[in-house]
Structures are given as structure tokens and as C-alpha cells.
A protein has these predicted regions:
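Substrate-binding cleft of carbohydrate-active enzyme catalytic domains
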Residues: 308, 321-414
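Catalytic cores of large soluble enzymes that bind and process phosphate-bearing ligands
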Residues: 100, 122, 264, 301, ...
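N-terminal accessory beta-strand-rich subdomains and adjacent acidic, glycine-rich linkers
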Residues: 15-298
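Bacterial Sec-dependent N-terminal signal peptides
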Residues: 1-15
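Solvent-exposed loop/turn segments at secondary-structure junctions
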Residues: 134, 278-280, 315-318, 375-378
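Conserved mixed alpha/beta catalytic, RNA-binding, or beta-rich assembly cores of soluble enzyme
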Residues: 282-285, 294-300, 313-324
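Boundary/entry segment of secreted carbohydrate-active catalytic domains
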Residues: 305-312
Length: 414
């Protein structure tokens, strides 16, 4: 591992490149003091000048309460530090035994004089992309704050081809679309009624998409926008300004619409951009793993990959059901007596069916069998805002946990 000395630089604009020179990241402040970055790959612009910052909520839980102000502009560069890092580490499991973590870093320490608040924006630039995050040191003027929205922009250089699914706080069960960026709005509008009729989907914007977002440019660059090290912070979606082709972060809110209750010191997740002229690098690049926090589990001997089959896909395709009976319009945990109900004949998680899967797993070298729909409550579990849906311990009458567990172990299956 090598770490170079930190070099303080009192400048408002600074450039850092990847160790191999392919990726260039430039930071600057606008005339209004708003943080801005841009990015290029092998001399081709990947991200046009894009704004950075956070809007904070006027909230009684914040240190400044209803007098809260934003972290969007009015900044001055207090210090800039650069460094190089190079190490090789071993993941618990993965495609490779070792992973090289090699990057050049630039940390821009900002101060907002009107509020006397400090914020650092840290950039790490790799061979195939970069990551950026916001860092908030503990300080009297920024001890507790509530996020209204994070405004991290990704300004695209053209009407790229996008591989995307609609933005949704709860599910990813959509069909992937392949359209130009300007086609996202049209597809969501066309399918909005079908989205409304599916109680598992809730599209939050006319141009919102989920990460990771895969893009391809007209001149053959592959770009992926995602995040890493998402801890104690909402997950990030992207909302597109399709007139200007600018994506902006859109955080998942809580029940009252707030998007983060922060106690400093605190670091946000990394916002990542992968880029290459070879599509295979989107999968082989280890940038996300390198930016994730190191594993904190001391004994990892119990963690291992496995192969399994399961009783669930036949419910998805409609040949079996999760529910045990069709007799009742609704059920109540602890009150409904399933032994008095007539089986519907399509229940998937039965003793007979699960034994069939166990036999298949044992014969074909699969280590485990996954079973859904074995416990009481599946008759009206979805789409009703029901409080008590499952108790997760009481099986249906046609599912014997003890006997099936013993049978599986006798076959060497879990």
C-alpha cells in the first residue's frame, strides 16, 4: 500500500486524473459559490458541468430549527487535499481472490461563510470511473440536520441510449426498457395506467429511473450511474430533466417525506460513475466493491455461496398459489382455523411438493431448497394496508416443518 503526502491547495478549481490517465475529474465553484464537477474519459466528455449540494428542511429536529438554510451555494474553498492510494485486498467471496484498490483522490474542503458551516466533497478517481461523496465534520452550526433533497447532478453529453426501469421506492419488478433518454417520459406515460393497476408498483415521477442506470453513447462509450456504501442513508434514484438531459439524485423519503435525519460527523454514500469503451468493463470493474465499507464481520467462515431451487417460481407463473384456501375473503392471524377450511388444491408449499424439490436438489447437487407460502396469512396479504399479515412461525395444515426438515437433512439438503 502506498499513500502520498497530502498537498493543501487554496484554489477554487482543481483537476484529478485516474492512475492510468484515462479519467479526468475537474471541480470548480460557480460565481454563486455552488460546487460543480465535470468528467471525461480518454479526452471525451462524459459528464458536463454538474451542480452538487443539499437542500435542508426547516424542521424542529434540526440544530437551526425553522431557520435552517441550504448547503447549495455561497461556498468558498477552504482547503484542497490530494493523495494516491494503492492496495490489494481479499474479499470474503467473489469472482476473484484479490481486488486491487488503486485511485487518486481529491478532497475539497468548503466553507459557507454566511452560516459558518464546513462541508467536504471527496472524489476518488479510478481506471474505469469515479466516486464522490459529501462529508460533514461535527460542528456547532451543523450538528443535526434534516435533508429535504440531495441535488447531485449528472449532466449528460447527449441523448444516450438508456437501459432502465421506472423509479419506484418499493419494487424493481418492472420490465427493462431500452430507449433514448428523451423517450423515458413517453414510455412511463404510456404504461402509467398499468402501473396504477398493479398494487406492487408506484412510479414517483414522469422521468424517474432506478439505479444502477446503464447508458450507451453514440460514439461507443458505456456509462453506469449508481452508488456505493449506502449506510444510514436513503437509497438514490435519478430524475431526468429531459429538456437539458440532466439527471439529478432523488432520495427515497420516509413516511412524511423527509429524506434523511443526519447527526454529524457523517459521510453520505458514494455516487459512482463507471465509464469505458468496452461494455464488459461494466461488469468486471470493482469500483463499487472498492468504495463499499470493508467487511466488519470478524469470523466469516460461515459465509459461503450456495445453489438452491425453490417453491416460488411456480407461484409467479401461476401454476401454484401461495395461499392454502379460497374459502375466505380475508383471514385473521390467531383466529382463522385453517383446519376447517377446504384446501384450494393449488397450494404450492405442501409436504408432497417440497419433498419433490428436496429429492431434485439432492439428485442434482443443489445444497438448499427455498420455500415460500408455507406459513399462515397468504390469502389476503397484499394490497390492503393490512397491519398483521404473517406471524412467520405457524405453518399451514399441509406443511410439516419438523418432518420436512428431517427429510431434507437425511438427503444432505438444507
Amino acid at each position: 500500500m502506498t499513500v502520498l503526502a497530502l498537498l493543501p491547495m487554496m484554489v477554487a478549481a482543481q483537476t484529478v486524473t485516474s492512475p492510468n490517465g484515462n479519467v479526468t475529474l475537474t471541480f470548480s465553484l460557480t460565481e454563486q459559490g455552488q460546487p460543480t464537477y465535470e468528467m471525461s474519459y480518454k479526452g471525451k466528455k462524459v459528464v458536463n458541468p454538474s451542480h452538487l449540494g443539499l437542500a435542508l428542511a426547516c424542521d424542529k429536529h434540526a440544530s437551526k430549527g425553522m431557520n435552517e438554510t441550504d448547503l447549495m451555494e455561497g461556498f468558498k474553498v477552504k482547503d484542497t487535499q490530494t493523495s494516491t492510494f494503492d492496495e490489494t485486498w481479499r474479499p470474503v467471496w467473489g469472482e476473484t481472490a484479490t481486488i486491487r484498490n488503486h485511485y487518486n483522490e481529491m478532497a475539497v474542503c468548503l466553507n459557507q461563510p454566511t452560516s459558518d458551516r464546513d462541508m467536504t466533497i471527496r472524489f476518488r478517481v479510478y481506471e474505469y470511473g469515479m466516486g464522490l461523496r459529501y462529508e460533514f465534520p461535527q460542528q456547532e452550526q451543523l450538528n443535526y440536520f434534516v435533508i429535504e433533497e440531495e441535488h447531485t447532478q449528472f449532466a449528460m453529453t447527449g441523448n444516450h441510449t438508456a437501459y432502465w426501469i421506472p423509479g419506484d421506492y418499493d419494487t424493481q419488478e418492472y420490465e427493462y426498457q431500452i430507449t433514448p433518454l428523451t423517450g423515458i417520459r413517453e414510455v412511463i406515460a404510456k404504461n402509467r395506467e398499468s402501473y396504477k393497476n398493479n398494487s406492487s408498483t408506484t412510479v414517483f415521477s414522469d422521468t424517474g429511473v432506478q439505479t444502477s442506470l446503464q447508458l450507451k453513447t453514440a460514439d461507443g462509450l458505456y456509462i453506469n450511474i449508481h452508488e456505493a456504501a449506502c449506510l444510514d442513508y436513503p437509497t438514490m434514484h435519478l430524475n431526468l430533466d429531459d429538456k437539458n438531459l440532466v439527471f439529478e439524485s432523488w432520495l427515497t423519503p420516509d413516511a412524511v417525506g423527509r429524506k434523511g435525519f443526519i447527526h454529524t460527523p457523517f459521510n453520505t454514500p458514494w455516487r459512482t460513475i463507471l465509464v469505458s469503451d468496452d461494455a464488459r468493463d461494466m461488469l468486471s470493474c470493482k469500483l463499487t466493491l472498492n468504495l463499499n465499507e470493508p467487511c466488519k464481520i470478524e469470523d466469516t467462515s460461515w459465509i459461503h455461496p450456495t445453489k438452491y431451487c425453490g417453491v416460488w417460481w411456480n407461484m409467479i407463473v401461476g401454476t401454484k398459489t401461495w395461499s392454502y384456501t379460497n374459502d375466505l375473503p380475508s383471514v385473521r392471524l390467531g383466529q382463522t382455523d385453517y383446519k376447517k377450511c377446504k384446501p384450494n388444491g393449488t397450494h404450492g408449499a405442501t409436504n408432497e411438493e417440497v419433498k419433490r424439490y428436496i429429492d431434485f436438489a439432492a439428485k442434482n447437487g443443489l445444497q438448499e431448497v427455498l420455500v415460500e407460502g408455507w406459513n399462515e396469512g397468504w390469502e389476503d396479504w397484499f394490497g390492503h394496508q393490512k397491519l398483521d399479515v404473517f406471524d412467520f412461525v405457524t405453518p399451514y395444515p399441509d406443511f410439516d416443518i419438523k418432518a420436512l426438515n428431517e427429510y431434507a437433512h437425511s438427503k444432505g439438503v438444507k
